[in-house]
């Protein structure tokens, strides 16, 4: 091609230089100036890796002065192009010589990039098309936010999360019994709300001791990186913003931190949170006359935040007044009068009794049939009532239908979810082993001396000290005191571990110092492999320790945890728990056993308690076991009895030698425990349990998600993505892959990939047993960021390939076109449920025939060969006019398909949202817990969704030219 001064060209190999201008030409060489980058390049005339930039009628170009021109015609004058058309700013006719084009011009349309020589690799085109297809398929899945969590698929948890996560601004109480996974349920709801765009700012308020547990759980299980706000972090953020809380989207803080400063609290309330989560909400004290400051603080936050999740103990444990106080935070208009609430609850008793009757499968008596008729009076249920007393096949179906109707009328079932272990099932037995050991003389002396020296300390402090004789001894003898040389618990532990070499054993003690000293003794005396877990370790260090313990090959036999260090970690792959000492209250005891006693635990849990006779430990073992039955069963009454007998218990712990009346004390506690437990059992609300555990629907949901695990398409796509992005992959045993950044990645920092790399697995069970392995799903940030990286930029948007096929004439030209049909709308409308960005593939020949239906993408792609960029540019220049004609023919074809997709999406959205609205309106007639704002929001959402779908459009997303060759 002849070169003329002033012509505009673009570099095939350095497109980032911008638009170049020919500034010098001689017989062998040409010089290009790239004004945007200030660079010069010298090229050989005969084989320069550059492409002439030529625009066509219909294109819009920008001048060096900034104004834009819509091109109507192009003419050539002395080797230079002149673009004629209309200016967009003042709509006047204008001409623009190519020398005056803006040098920073970028080519966004695939066809522009193709004609400008910015041609990508063939494998990137294939990756882009696959990314479009997978993104479309995943958007249509109805369980978004539930599949990617690093947790077992427990039906009742999935049911609650799905039920609540789908709502507009959910305001609910999660009150499952301990060990049933309230934190995971909350995490799934948060994850769903964030992915769906219903929430973007989340505040979690927890007791100070649980901050790190939540931080770890959200990161490890859901890949949600929360910021922990304490005094130090607050002071730092204050330098960047007048309201420090606006510097982060996802925040965790403690209730104490919230309350310590009026200014800070005001800033927190004035931040636009979308979702508020409050853990341990039962500690918020309320009475009609004097609500506590903590309660009032959360009340103010709940009033200012659209969505609220309260995590709390079960209503039966709390008592009705405390339960009402929680509900009042969620909906003060609905729950405004306590006496009215009590009366209303009494009315639900017959509903719950009716459900119990139907569940039992027994025939209903006349009085019971009358109760059912009264409860469901506005509907014709006569045929159903006849069926439940017949022996017909419809009996069970009729019972289920009546239960569903009753559930709709249940007062608080939309705002309260509560599962019990009894209702959920699947928990292991706990077996207690008490190991009584003699009290060493050294400890006897230390305890006596400590009692004299610390006589002025508060009684509770002295009682706590008495539980840890090794700490007392060390305080008296100094840091060099080697208590482990004479403490019989250490000798017993060594023998136990050497005898049970094949068992994974979790050892928990109160203090980090004790944990570290025990690890040293095990290592030096018996070469026992042990990992240590304490509050002084970072999250990453704890992950490594937990992974070392979890590993079957060369892993640690024992993990030694401090009380605080073990919070929020579960090790259900182990079944042996050694309590080297005992915690001070029953909640902490349950928390310790709860590390192993989870759903998914396959074996009986062996709870081993070595204790020293004639000490506070010995007394506490008896009280926990004989008084509360807290070792072998969960103890919902523990806190109530502990609070009632707190003073007497403390006194007995500090005066171990004088234990008159101990048997009576323990007997009294046991009687109260049995009585309270019986009351709780009688108060069980079977209807609420049914609603909360989801029944058969929950089982089907878990099954459906499990079937998507180990998705072969995900594995293939992910490995292909990592290859093309340039991420190093190293296969390890046990389905593990190590990913590390390389020096030649598409982007310098791939979002979600740490600088030092990470270990991944596609296997859920493997991820659960390996704390250091990330569980890769379609919802994982590595995959979502990878999809965004490919689809939001130009990666793979144009390519050229050769097809070796002797059945076709040489030079046959095909254009593979990928259009995207999409609607632009705010994320919270979730338009992707109905019309996610949808790829439409056409395969055009020169005659305008679409061959896509006959030629499947993957098989076609396997037959193609790559072409280098320079040759590709020459091919494109040779067939440019043909490609323009093919694109025009394709426009008419794609319009038909696109309009059909848009119409179907509109119909589906209208039907689904109308049904949802009608269901809620029908429920509102019989259940006052349907909030008016929910109905209004749903109606508004329907109108906005349909309006935005009406505006949906389509565009060319990628183009690949295919030329037939016989060589």
Curated annotation (Swiss-Prot):
**What superkingdom heads the lineage?**
Bacteria
Query: Mind telling me what this protein is named?
Result: RNA polymerase-associated protein RapA
Q: Which InterPro entries match?
A: Helicase_ATP-bd, Helicase_C-like, Helicase_RapA, P-loop_NTPase, RapA_C, SNF2-like_sf, SNF2/RAD54-like_C, SNF2_N
Q: Which residues form the Helicase ATP-binding domain?
A: 163-333
Q: What is the lineage of its organism?
A: Bacteria, Pseudomonadati, Pseudomonadota, Gammaproteobacteria, Enterobacterales
For the motif DEAH box, give the residue ranges. 279-282
- List the PANTHER family hit by this protein, alphabetically: DNA ANNEALING HELICASE AND ENDONUCLEASE ZRANB3 FAMILY MEMBER, SWI_SNF-RELATED MATRIX-ASSOCIATED ACTIN-DEPENDENT REGULATOR OF CHROMATIN SUBFAMILY A-LIKE PROTEIN 1
What's the gene?
A: rapA
Q: What does this protein do?
A: Transcription regulator that activates transcription by stimulating RNA polymerase (RNAP) recycling in case of stress conditions such as supercoiled DNA or high salt concentrations. Probably acts by releasing the RNAP, when it is trapped or immobilized on tightly supercoiled DNA. Does not activate transcription on linear DNA. Probably not involved in DNA repair.
Q: How does it assemble?
A: Interacts with the RNAP. Has a higher affinity for the core RNAP than for the holoenzyme. Its ATPase activity is stimulated by binding to RNAP.
Question: Whose protein is this, by species?
Answer: Pectobacterium atrosepticum (strain SCRI 1043 / ATCC BAA-672)
